[in-house]
Amino acid sequence: MSKGIVLLAAGGTGGHVFPAEALAFKLKERGYSVHLVTDSRAERYAGKFPAEEIHVVPSATIGSKNPVAVARSLWTLWSGMRAAKKLIQRLQPVIVVGFGGYPTVPPLLAATRLGVPSMIHEQNAVMGRANKALATRVQAIAGGFLPEGGAAFPDKTVTTGNPVRPAIIAAAEVPYTPSHPGEAFNLVVFGGSQGAQYFSKALPTAISLLDDALRVRLRITQQVRPEDMEMVSGCVARLEMGADIAPFFTDMAERLARAHLVICRSGASTVSEISVIGRPAVLVPYPHALDHDQAANAAALAATGGAKVIAQSELSPEKIAAILTAVMNDPEKLSHMAAAAKLAGKPDAANLLADMVEAIAARRTIAEFKRTRA
């Protein structure tokens, strides 16, 4: 018999859906039924998301200054509120949990108005707009990187970390083994489409600037856009070095486990994964993020000593070559960075988040939860 229904709400992008998915698995293990509220973008995840049912509720973001567009968005939000209220009244969930993105606004507002326990999870080091709008209304805030003491809502914030997928937990069992002079050096480079495009242009040039003794040590895994495959593969072939170049790697967790250095963007999931595994990183925040969330995520890991942060505007091929030269000749420094990253990781985030959900569903206060958490 189910302990009750937990209604999860998440925007339709992977950054919102993946932590919700990790929590859903944990809650189902504990005997709860799980439903998901999202938008049509999440239909691609429907096959593997462990929900009894996935519900699409109307929602919209108010980002335009056009009065007609604003009126249309407000009407959509009002319609979503009505639909979410009916859904909650029908399902009778024990709690509603939001993971950010504008589709979370109607169900979380409806829950607070109906007196249903509610909480949000913020993946980044700074709150997104949807979560910021909901923060004053919910009973609790779980944070991937939000500090408990210095957050905007310290009395109801718990730093749980970001839940990571099982493959990452398995990869975390692999200890970091430094690469000494003369030994192979595994470099993993990846980022979203914008990051992949930038790295595709900068990295081959940077590698061409390395001394031959360093270049022959490199073993590169690089994620590139399909349209850049031919160009990057050609550059790498001319450099006569070992490289795997592809738009997507199904075994990225294993490749991260073998990495001696990672160069990547600093989305919340990425930073969480490399810290759980414990690998040194050069983080290049996406420069056009609305809330500068990637810069804040990167700064959080850099503060522990587990990463070096470089703005994209400063990351020339010459700079990359200088960094590679320095770290490939200093395995001890990379080992210290790996250890620092590992200490910052939160491999038990999904369990802690599930504990928090159960506590809020039982109408316990955050103060009580903090006193009794593991």
Swiss-Prot record:
Function: Cell wall formation. Catalyzes the transfer of a GlcNAc subunit on undecaprenyl-pyrophosphoryl-MurNAc-pentapeptide (lipid intermediate I) to form undecaprenyl-pyrophosphoryl-MurNAc-(pentapeptide)GlcNAc (lipid intermediate II).
GO biological process: carbohydrate metabolic process; cell division; cell wall organization; lipid glycosylation; peptidoglycan biosynthetic process; regulation of cell shape
GO molecular function, one term: UDP-N-acetyl-D-glucosamine:N-acetylmuramoyl-L-alanyl-D-glutamyl-meso-2,6-diaminopimelyl-D-alanyl-D-alanine-diphosphoundecaprenol 4-beta-N-acetylglucosaminlytransferase activity
Pfam families assigned to the protein according to its UniProt record, in alphabetical order: Glyco_tran_28_C, Glyco_transf_28
Protein name: UDP-N-acetylglucosamine--N-acetylmuramyl-(pentapeptide) pyrophosphoryl-undecaprenol N-acetylglucosamine transferase
CDD domains: GT28_MurG
Record keywords: Cell cycle, Cell division, Cell inner membrane, Cell membrane, Cell shape, Cell wall biogenesis/degradation, Glycosyltransferase, Membrane, Peptidoglycan synthesis, Transferase
Binding-site residues, UDP-N-acetyl-alpha-D-glucosamine: 13-15, 124, 165, 193, 294
Subcellular location, principal: membrane
EC top class named in words: transferase
Pathway: Cell wall biogenesis; peptidoglycan biosynthesis
Gene: murG
Species name: Rhizobium johnstonii (strain DSM 114642 / LMG 32736 / 3841)
Catalytic activity: di-trans,octa-cis-undecaprenyl diphospho-N-acetyl-alpha-D-muramoyl-L-alanyl-D-glutamyl-meso-2,6-diaminopimeloyl-D-alanyl-D-alanine + UDP-N-acetyl-alpha-D-glucosamine = di-trans,octa-cis-undecaprenyl diphospho-[N-acetyl-alpha-D-glucosaminyl-(1->4)]-N-acetyl-alpha-D-muramoyl-L-alanyl-D-glutamyl-meso-2,6-diaminopimeloyl-D-alanyl-D-alanine + UDP + H(+)
Membrane topology: Peripheral membrane protein
Highest taxon of the lineage: Bacteria
